[in-house]
Design a protein with these regions (language model features):
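Post-HExxH zinc-binding segment in Zn-dependent metallohydrolases
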Residues: 1-15, 191-219
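Long amphipathic alpha-helical segments used for membrane anchoring, targeting, substrate engagement
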Residues: 1-71
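Active-site recognition of the HExxH zinc-binding catalytic motif
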Residues: 38, 97, 140, 163-176, ...
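Catalytic zinc-binding patch centered on the HExxH motif and its immediate surroundings
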Residues: 51, 115-141
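Short helix/loop segments within enzyme catalytic domains
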Residues: 84-90, 94-102, 202-245
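Short pre-active-site segment immediately N-terminal to the catalytic Zn-binding motif
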Residues: 146-163, 191-197
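Catalytic Zn2+-binding segment of zinc metalloproteases
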Residues: 169-184, 215
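Pan-zinc metallopeptidase signature
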Residues: 241-286
Length: 286
C-alpha cells in the first residue's frame, strides 16, 4: 500500500494509551491456552459475552488521556512515525462508510496494552481486535499484528492490518443496520451456516468493499492498493479461517464448532466485496 503524503489525517479517530489496569474480570492462562483464546475470539465482536464476563465495566478505567497519534495530521507523517498508518486506515474506512451509509456514526479505534475496560466487559490483549457495540468502538492491541504473523502464520503487511480494521468497522456497519442485534438476539449456535459465521463473513465482504473504494477519492490517505496488497489481505483472511486454526492448534477440523468461517469462505467473501464494490453484494444470510 502507498500513502498520499499530502492528505489530511484526523488523529481524533484513533486513541491510545489505554490498558494496564488491575481490575480485570477476564482470567486468561498462558502458553498454548492464550493462543487458543486468540484464535477462538479473533476478529470477534463482544469479548465479555464470549468469555463469560458480560458485566459492564467503567470504560475509563486504566485509560490515559494522552494519545500517541496526536501528531498524525498529514499523510507524510506516516514516513516519520509508522503508527500513523493506523490513522490512515481508520480515516479511509470511515470516509467511505460515511458517504455510503445513511446517518453513519464516526467512531473511534482505541488502542491499548495489556487489558482495557469497555462497555462489553474487561478485555485483554489475548482477545484480539474487537468491536464493542456497547460503546461503539473498535479495540486493538497493536501487538496483535505480531501474533498474526508469528502464531497464525500470516504474511502480514499493511494491507493485512487494514483488512483486520476494515472487518471490525464492518461490524459497526452491521450494528447501524440492525444486523448485529438480530443475530445476537437469535438462536445462536455454531457451524458453517450459523448466524454468527454469516455475520463474520459479511464483515469480511464489507472489508473487501472498502478496499475497492480505498483510492477513489484523490484526498484519500491511501493512494495505491496493488494486487500484492490484496494477496496479503486474502492471506490474512485465510490465516484466521476456522479450519486453518483448528488444524494448526488441534490437528483436526470440526466444522460444527466454527464461529468465523473457513479460510476459503473468508477469502471468497473478501473477494466478493472487492470485486463488486457494492455492500448489497454482501448478503451472506441469503
Amino acid at each position: 500500500m502507498k500513502y498520499n503524503e499530502g492528505a489530511n489525517l484526523d488523529p481524533s479517530q484513533v486513541g491510545g494509551g489505554g490498558g494496564g489496569g488491575n481490575g480485570g474480570k477476564i482470567a486468561i492462562g498462558g502458553g498454548a491456552g492464550v493462543v487458543v483464546l486468540i484464535l477462538a475470539l479473533l476478529l470477534g465482536i463482544n469479548p465479555g459475552d464470549v468469555l463469560g464476563s458480560g458485566d459492564q465495566a467503567d470504560p475509563g478505567t486504566g485509560q490515559a488521556p494522552a494519545s500517541p497519534f496526536a501528531q498524525c495530521t498529514r499523510g507524510s507523517d506516516i514516513g516519520k512515525d509508522r503508527n500513523c498508518r493506523f490513522v490512515a486506515y481508520t480515516n479511509s474506512i470511515q470516509d467511505y462508510w460515511g458517504g455510503t451509509v445513511q446517518d453513519y456514526q464516526v467512531i473511534k479505534v482505541q488502542t491499548f496494552t495489556g487489558q482495557i475496560s469497555t462497555a462489553c466487559g474487561t478485555a485483554t490483549s489475548e482477545v484480539g481486535p474487537f468491536y464493542c457495540s456497547g460503546d461503539t468502538a473498535v479495540y486493538l492491541d497493536l501487538g496483535f499484528f505480531d501474533e498474526l504473523t508469528t502464531k497464525l502464520g500470516a504474511q502480514g503487511g499493511d494491507a493485512a492490518e487494514a483488512y483486520v480494521l476494515a472487518h471490525e468497522f464492518g461490524h459497526h456497519v452491521q450494528d447501524l443496520e440492525g444486523t448485529l442485534q438480530r443475530v445476537q438476539g437469535g438462536s445462536g449456535g455454531t457451524g458453517p451456516t450459523s448466524p454468527g459465521v454469516r455475520l463474520e463473513l459479511q464483515a469480511d465482504c464489507y472489508a473487501g468493499v472498502w478496499f475497492n473504494h480505498a483510492t477513489n477519492d484523490p484526498q484519500s490517505p491511501i493512494s495505491e492498493v496493488t494486487q500484492a496488497d490484496l494477496d496479503d489481505a486474502l492471506d490474512a483472511a485465510a490465516a484466521v479461517g476456522d479450519d486453518r486454526i483448528q488444524k494448526k492448534m488441534q490437528g483436526q477440523v470440526n466444522p460444527e464448532t466454527w464461529t468465523h468461517g473457513s479460510a476459503a469462505n473468508r477469502q471468497k467473501w473478501l473477494t466478493t466485496g472487492f470485486q463488486s464494490g457494492d455492500p448489497a453484494s454482501c448478503d451472506t444470510f441469503a
